[in-house]
């Protein structure tokens, strides 16, 4: 069995690596076209989630930009007592979405996707789309309203309905920043769609980088 281990380990390692797409370089964070060009998994996952849950891809991507800067294993920094003893992290937020354990469990239970991982691009995009759909159903937030969608994402559905964000001026500033980022991404998508559609048919294959009406 020991002799077989290396041959089994290599394909398994390759499978695990293939399931996690690479993080885009920092220089491309503010350009959605560059992120999509770096790794088409971002594009595919964002458009799939948009089609499934109704939140535009540019808003989904703006959420990831704010929450993790596209870092798959992002989590709150750990503080140290006396500079030596590691203390518990401030929350269980983890991965591209920075979803905490209870919210991620609710997503898995609701969708039946028990194998979903917060380090996986497709699962992460699907989670944000799903959560925004809950905001739409429970709090009546338009799936195009980046500002209020983000407030609900941060505060939770109950917190949003209680308007806890009104006591957090800093959070409203962050929500505004996410809104600006989504607008930037939206405009970029229009431009890179034009460039994409004008490329040769052999390269474009009729593919569009956004859902209607951006194509």
Task: Walk through the language-model features, giving the residues of each.
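Bacterial N-terminal signal peptides that target proteins for export
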Residues: 1-8
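C-terminal motif of bacterial Sec signal peptides marking the signal peptidase cleavage site
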Residues: 16-19
